[in-house]
Amino acid sequence: MNKPKIFIDGEAGTTGLQIYSRLNERDDIELVSIAASKRKDADERAKLLNSVDVAILCLPDDAAREAVSLVNSSQVKILDASTAYRTAQGWVYGFPEMNPGQREKIANAQFVSNPGCYPTGFLACVRPLIAQGILPSSFPITINAVSGYSGGGKSLIQKYDSFHEQQKGATSDYPFGIYGLQFGHKHVKEMHQHSGLASPPLFIPAVGDFEQGMLVQIPLPLWTLDNPPSGEEIHQAIAQYYQGEKFVQVAPFKDPSLLRDGTFLDATAVNGTNIVQVFVFGNDNTKEALLVARLDNLGKGASGAAVQNLNIMLGLPEELGL
């Protein structure tokens, strides 16, 4: 039986390198690569794109659109890791745990968009509550999130790594900073479309002086609701939604052992995995709750999710290579 052929268009980038590393040791697939000198050769790329079973695009948005235009074979499946097609018609959103039946859609699709890192954490927390009517679709959602600097790609990685090398481990000039202050972050449309919310969430991302890891926080002022759910009810609803899932883990409610020194929620604890952990914190007296997702922005937030989606698209056990 022939092994399925996989081509990573953009394998030299941050996500591409991570996916290549995860796939290179596997003996159940055949990786097809392009010579470094021909990475910008449209004819050579088109030849490779149309010769494989699955093409994984790890490219900027415009380059991803160009790559899709080069594919003329209906037998080639495309998994795009850019933001170009995450809200596009004709594309299946590659978050298998998001909805019942999502895996089947991914398995049967020719075109699959790999989710963004921030949206993965956000949707893991909020989608179950909207889908089950625990929160109304009109609920105003705010997201505060922090990612390691690898989320900024090669340029930001080089900036931080260079500073660390020069200063022999000292923190950088920008140990923590928020951005996206024009409220136009490219992930907002994706979050809105796939969450079931009536209005876009207010999203404020940040970058910290650590390489990878991510915390996505959603505060819930439950006192604004006429009959607010308790923190435990919210936790139960999310836990039930993800029952039996391998890569979405709902942490026990009010378990101090999950916190560093009983106080801190560490952004880096699941690095190197394809796991997103969901936490629920609540105070029923003040009618407040906090949802937190913890994930590796390069794992379940990028390359790990891509490998999981690839496995589903090929009809393989989705944990292979993860």
From Swiss-Prot:
This protein's record includes keyword Phosphoprotein: no
Pfam families for this protein: Semialdhyde_dh (PF01118), Semialdhyde_dhC_1 (PF22698)
GO cellular component terms given for this protein: cytoplasm
Signal sequence residues: none
Alphabetized UniProt keyword annotations: Amino-acid biosynthesis, Arginine biosynthesis, Cytoplasm, NADP, Oxidoreductase
Entry annotated with the keyword Cell inner membrane: no
Enzyme class of the recorded protein, top EC level: oxidoreductase
Entry-linked HAMAP family: ArgC_type2 (MF_01110)
Protein name according to UniProt: N-acetyl-gamma-glutamyl-phosphate reductase 2
